[in-house]
Swiss-Prot record:
The keyword Glycoprotein applies. Changing C442S: 20-fold reduction to fibulin-2 binding. A motif (Cell attachment site) lies at residues 586-588. Residues 1-21 form the signal peptide. GO terms for biological process: cell adhesion. SMART domains: EGF, EGF_Lam, LamB. Residues 28-83, 84-130, 139-186, 187-196, 382-415, 416-461, 462-516, 517-572, 573-602 form the Laminin EGF-like domain. This is Laminin subunit gamma-2. Epithelial cells of many tissues, particularly high levels in tongue, hair follicles and kidney. Basement membranes of the collecting tubules of kidney and pancreas. Keywords: Basement membrane, Cell adhesion, Coiled coil, Disulfide bond, Extracellular matrix, Glycoprotein, Heparin-binding, Laminin EGF-like domain, Proteoglycan, Repeat, Secreted, Signal. Changing K206A: No fibulin-1C binding. No change to fibulin-2 binding.
Length: 1191
């Protein structure tokens, strides 16, 4: 079978449409620059040599590789073509002359057009700019307001700048700034004023995070909002976050960067950032700003660039809507200002890919504040119109209220509508108490009721569910509910807000509370109408998703629509249109292949079996396989020693047969190779002809379309002619009736019969003329039909490819084109004839009218000859009408035939496409080996990446082992220190037991303490088994020192001092206990203070609740508020302040006690050090000491 596949592949390779160079120079004449060419029929027809060179070397191009490619040149014909290397900005094109000189733009010079001429500067896409010194000396422009150099002697201002010197802002703008691409900043003023100027009351203020002490309130989150670890580097004074997965992690800014940042508009946000490892490809979501329901984002770098690895770089972003700031989506001016007014989130991407780490430092947001200092001229001061006040016209003036409270400072201010012309609350519009008309008493309505505007003394319940308050719109007297729950809107809170669905009142079915639409994050959060507000069906799915909840992929796409990363959601099916079912792929992206195709994308021909043309090859290969198996059997017998001398003879014979068969196969292959080359040439020729036929068929199709259009025009004109003839017939009938009823008196009106006869003859002549025109039109239609049929027949012959040579094909095509041109001319002639017939018919109609007028003037004429002549004219008109009807039918048949011919032409075109598809299948088989090699390369790359990851993990493990080793060594060092301390404790314990054996009761306490120390040391020895030997040595040392009691007199005093210190320790212990007791008491007092504070806060909440109640406030309510405030102040002064003073005093005393304890501990440590020095100075050995007392 392997040999069979090899034969198949060999056959496919021999069919490739390229001709290898042969010894005949007339085949591939490529000037030594290529060894491949292909036959081109059109080139052969034009030049007589039909071979076109392929894959020209040495940067050459042309039919015979005779010239250099675009952007290359050479000094002589046989030289290599060298690159021009023309500068992309300074040259007019990529080409150059034979010397390598590029064509330069104005003001540019150099062989490569890469530098400016003297007197010019700044090379740009438009060339070099002339120096200012070369310009008009009167050109005096403000550099902050011009958009470019003053080349023409006049200043070219930025869009928001005006003035002869570009030194003034246009009306509605302020603050001329050189860094502003618009020149000046538009007045904001919340949209209430277009007049403003720079404020002198604000100074520059920078909101920064330098991370010198800690993370400064920053956090780290994943894309889905889950928290991530954020680390602070004490060494580098920055923060960083790492990720093991590809999902990105973001730095989240603290509250000081959020909130109302209006004064930062037009200023910069900058930070230092670096990334280690990872993908390092910037994305559109690197920096994200959110606020007021809007979101904008920007990449760290331009698309196509890569973030530097391990290098800290400062990134700066301008906070405005100008396209140069690279924020997307691009907001309007007021949308951007609205976002900055309520900035709710600032996120900076930290990681890029797996095992990525991002570092951030020196975050700076340029802002301003109303204090003295360096001026901030970008802050505006508005000139407010009537009804507004404040620096930014953000407040309503006295006597005005907010028209729409939900818009906040963006809402318009309108006059108060209080009875008596009184003032009102600027935000709610409620009239102040005492400002109403004193003659009318208004009822004080509770929550859930409102004043009837027609009867202010009565209260009506609000038409709101759940007892929500309401108010009356002054203009329309409409009752509107206030404070609807989240997700609910409408005048009666009866509708779900945008982004929510349900039916709060059950007006269209069962009651369903409003809930957020579940579209699986597959809609644009900034868009409106993402889902149906009643059913919740998602209407604007993005990321190629579909379904009720955007939880499915659209037809022709696959992937996970619920993936958090948009790049991992639905992707287009990458299926071969030739080998796959249209518009279908499976959930894993694999395509549904047609029969005979395979592979993930159905782009590989399925190699289940060879085509039918290889059956003979398969039979021959089966025979060779059988012979090979018999040879193997003979060899096995020969190796086994069986069969005597007969086997070698048979083996040799079979080998000779095999060699002969191989020679035959080789000869056949060589013959087949020549045949295959001829087939390849013919295939290339057939492809070229196929392209020509396809082009000509397209021309025929266009011609048929034009003929159809002309036919429609002719049909319309024939219908017009028929209509005119009908009108003529009616006119003639009327004339005949008049003639029949006319009596002519010879004495009054005598008209000779010759006059009527001449009129009748003229009418007859006109009718004959129309008949001839109709016959001519019919003949033209028949000729058009014949020519179209001939063209269709010839097209069929051409596409079938049978029955003639290339020259015959060429002649046939030329004949077909001639017929086509003749058909076009006939169509034009037909159009002219139809137009002429139309004109003639109209003339006849007008003449008939004149005849009718003449006849109407004849009163009482009774001439039988006139009646006969009129009947003859009518018959002539009837025959003309019948002829026109037949002509119309003929045109209809031609039009129908044109439709059929178009259908047949389309079928022929589809046949050509099918043949082209067969050729593409052969090419796809030839590319199979290449695809397999690419797959092997991909597998090799994957293996390399896996090995690299393993190496990285091993290195990290090595570092961890080194860290653990260092910790173990440190623990071993501490172990020796602990052992030494245990030995010292045991030594001192033995000394205390020997020296204080007959001490007084005061020293007994020290002995007990030493015993306890011995017990502690014994427990430590049990825990550390390796210290038993040292404990024994310590015991031996204690026995040796027992014999030198005389030398311990001085040490006795030290031990007494130690006992005294222990007594002090006990005293300090009591002091500590006292401190603990006092701390507990302080905690109790703090708890009591907390209760008091909570009571005070409850009182304040109650006061604020009373203040927030709608409606007017009477004097009694004001007195209750004042009493509540007085009680709260009294409670704070009488209870909280003494408690705070007492707590501060106790904290001071505790600090003093701690200081005393630290001093005592230092003294004890010094005594221990002194004892250690005494012990070290004692001489070793045994001594015969005297008893302390003589008996």
């Amino acid at each position: 079978m392997p040999a069979l596949w090899l034969s198949c592949c060999l056959g496919v390779a021999l069919l490739l449409p390229a001709a290898q160079a042969t010894s005949r120079r007339e085949v591939c004449d490529c000037n030594g620059k290529s060894r491949q060419c292909v036959f081109d029929q059109e080139l052969h027809r034009q030049t007589g040599s039909g071979f076109r060179c392929l894959n020209c070397n040495d940067n050459t191009a042309g039919v015979h590789c005779e010239r250099c490619r675009e952007g290359f040149y050479r000094h002589r014909d046989r030289d290599r073509c060298l690159p021009c290397n023309c500068h992309s900005k300074g040259s007019l094109s990529a080409g150059c002359d034979n010397s390598g000189q590029c064509r330069c733009k104005p003001g540019v010079t150099g062989q490569r057009c890469d530098r400016c001429q003297p007197g010019f500067h700044m090379l740009t896409d438009a060339g070099c700019t002339r120096d200012q010194g070369q310009l008009d000396s009167k050109c005096d422009c403000d550099p902050a307001g011009i958009s470019g150099p003053c080349d023409s002697g006049r200043c070219v201002c930025k869009p928001a700048v005006t003035g002869e010197r570009c030194d003034r802002c246009r009306p509605g703008y302020y603050h001329l700034d050189r860094a502003n691409p618009e020149g000046c900043t538009q007045c904001f003023c919340y949209g209430h004023s277009a007049s403003c100027h720079a404020s002198a009351d604000f100074s520059v203020h920078k909101i920064t995070s330098t991370f010198s002490q800690d993370v400064d309130g920053w956090k780290a989150v994943q894309r889905n909002g889950a928290p991530a670890k954020l680390h602070w580097s004490q060494r580098h004074r920055d923060v960083f976050s790492s990720a093991r997965r590809s999902d990105p992690v973001y730095f989240v800014a603290p509250a000081k960067f959020l909130g109302n940042q209006q004064v930062s508009y037009g200023q910069s946000l900058s930070f230092d950032y670096r990334v280690d490892r990872g993908g390092r490809q910037p994305s559109a979501y690197d920096v994200i700003l959110e606020g007021a329901g809007l979101q904008i984002r920007a990449p760290l770098m331009a698309p196509g660039k890569t973030l530097p690895c391990g290098i800290t770089k400062t990134y700066t972003f301008r906070l405005n809507e100008h396209p140069s700031s690279h924020w997307s989506p691009q907001l309007s001016y007021f949308e951007y200002r609205r976002l900055l007014r309520n900035l709710t989130a600032l996120l900076i991407r930290a990681t890029y890919g797996e095992y990525s780490t991002g570092y951030i430092d020196n975050v700076t947001l340029v802002s301003a504040r109303p204090v003295s200092g360096a001026p901030a001229p970008w802050v505006e001061r508005c000139v407010c119109p009537a009804g507004y006040k404040g620096q930014f016209c953000q407040e309503c003036a006295s006597g005005y209220k907010r028209d729409s409270a939900r818009l906040g400072p963006f809402g318009a201010c309108v006059p108060c509508n209080c009875q008596g012309g009184g003032a009102c609350d600027p935000d709610t519009g409620d009239c102040y108490s005492g400002d109403e008309n004193p003659d009318i008493e208004c009822a004080d309505c509770p929550i859930g009721f409102y004043n009837d505007p027609h009867d202010p003394r009565s209260c009506k319940p609000c038409p709101c569910h759940n007892g929500f308050s309401c108010s009356v719109m002054p203009e329309t007297e409409e009752v509107v509910c206030n404070n609807c729950p989240p997700g609910v809107t409408g005048a009666r809170c009866e509708l779900c807000a945008d982004g929510f669905f349900g039916d709060p009142f059950g007006e269209r079915g069962p009651v369903r509370p409003c809930q957020r639409c579940q579209c699986n994050n597959n809609v644009d959060p900034n868009a409106s109408g993402n889902c149906d507000q009643l059913t919740g069906r998602c209407l604007k799915c993005i990321y190629n998703t579909a379904g009720v909840y955007c939880d499915q992929c659209k037809a022709g796409y696959f992937g996970d629509p619920l993936a958090p990363n948009p790049a991992d959601k639905c992707r287009a099916c990458n299926c071969s249109p030739m080998g796959s079912e249209p518009g279908e792929c499976r959930g894993d992206g694999s395509c549904v292949c047609k029969p005979g195709f395979g592979g993930l994308n159905c782009d590989h021909a399925a190699l289940t079996s060879c085509p039918a043309c290889y059956n003979q090859v398969k039979i021959q290969m089966d025979q060779f396989t059988q012979q090979l198996q018999s040879l193997e059997a003979l060899v096995s017998k020969a190796q086994g020693g069986g069969g005597g001398g007969t086997v070698p003879v048979q083996l040799e014979g079979r080998i000779e047969q095999a060699e002969q068969a191989l020679q035959d196969i080789l000869g056949e292959a060589q013959i087949s190779e020549g045949a295959m080359r001829a087939v390849a040439v013919r295939l290339a020729k057939a492809r070229s002809q196929e392209n020509d036929y396809k082009t000509r068929l397209d021309d025929l199709k266009m011609t048929a379309e034009r003929i159809r259009a002309l036919g429609s025009q002719h049909q319309n004109r024939v219908q017009d002619t028929s209509r005119l003839i009908s009108q003529m017939r009616l006119s003639l009938a009327g004339s005949e009736a008049l003639l029949e009823n006319t009596n002519i008196h010879s004495s009054e009106h005598y008209v000779g019969p010759n006059d009527f006869k001449s009129l009748a003859q003229e009418a007859t002549r006109k009718a004959d003329s129309h008949a001839e025109s109709a016959n001519a039109m019919k003949q033209l239609a028949r000729e058009t039909e014949d020519y179209s049929k001939q063209a269709l027949s010839l097209a069929r012959k051409l596409l079938s490819g049978g029955g003639g040579s290339g020259s015959w094909d060429s002649s046939v095509v030329q004949g077909l084109m001639g017929k086509l041109e003749k058909t076009k001319s006939l169509s034009q002639q037909l159009s002219l004839e139809g137009t002429q017939a139309d004109i003639e018919a109209d003339r006849s109609y007008q003449h008939s009218l004149r005849l009718l007028d003449s006849a109407s003037q004849l009163q009482g004429v009774s001439d039988l000859s006139f009646q006969v002549e009129a009947k003859r004219i009518r018959q002539k008109a009837d025959s003309l009408s019948n002829l026109v009807t037949r002509q119309t039918d003929a045109f209809t048949r031609v039009r129908n035939n044109l439709g059929n011919w178009e259908k047949e032409t389309r079928q022929l075109l589809q046949t050509g496409k099918d043949r082209r598809q067969t050729s593409d299948q052969l090419l796809s088989r030839a590319n199979l080996a290449k695809n397999r090699a690419q797959e092997a390369l991909s597998m090799g790359n994957a293996t390399f990446y896996e090995v690299e990851n393993i190496l990285k993990n091993l290195r990290e493990f090595d570092l961890q082992v080194e860290d653990r080793k260092a910790e173990a060594e440190e623990a071993m060092k501490r172990l020796s220190s602990i052992s030494q301390k245990v030995a010292d404790a045991s030594d001192k314990t033995q000394q205390a037991e020997t020296a204080l054996g007959s001490a007084t009761a005061d020293t007994q306490r020290a002995k007990n303490a030493a015993r306890e120390a011995l017990e502690i040391s014994s427990e430590i020895e049990l825990e550390i088994g390796s210290l038993n030997l040292e404990a024994n040595v310590t015991a031996d040392g204690a026995l040796a020192m027992e014999k030198g009691t005389a030398t311990l007199k001085s040490e006795m005093r030290e031990m007494i001092e130690l006992a005294r210190k222990e007594l002090e320790f006990d005293t300090d212990k009591d002091t500590v206990q006292l401190v603990i007791t006092e701390a507990q008491q302080a905690d109790a007092r703090a708890t009591s203070a907390g209760v008091t504070i909570q009571d005070t806060l409850n009182t304040l909440d109650g006061i604020l609740h009373l203040i927030d109640q709608p409606g007017s406030v009477d004097e009694e309510g004001m007195m209750l508020l004042e009493q509540g405030l007085f009680q709260a102040k009294t409670q704070i002064n009488s209870r909280l302040r003494p408690l705070m003073s007492d707590l501060e005093e106790r904290v001071r005393r505790q600090r003093n006690h701690l200081h005393l304890l630290e001093t005592s501990i230092d003294g004890i440590l010094a005594d221990v050090k002194n004892l250690e020095n005494i012990r070290d100075n004692l001489p070793p050995g045994c001594y015969n000491t005297q008893a302390l007392e003589q008996q």
